[in-house]
Amino acid sequence: IFVPVEIDGELLVDGGLIENVPVSPLREAGARFVIGVDLSAGRDYQRPQDIIDVFANAIDIAIDNVTRSQTSEADLIVAPRLSSYSRRDMSRIPELIEEGYRSTEQLLDKLKS
């Protein structure tokens, strides 16, 4: 969840808890084919060490439930395996990007065959 930002006088907030995979707004805007990205596929929840971890896991579980519901409406789903990554660890972003790229390439290869 990112800090809200103001752009052109409007306050924009992270939609991760509500609209993590915005399939419905895309359909409403006229999209006929929607590719969703499921960043919660195969997630392992870490054993909580303190109350902050408990709340963090609760938020992760809520986000994952919303994501599953929304990705079911997509026509195609890219689902990189991110079980070894934490949503809160920003130091591994290059690895996450590479994993997403790899997953997308694999999906495209399947579609071509």
Language-model segments: what does each one mean?
Residues I1-S113:
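Patatin-like phospholipase
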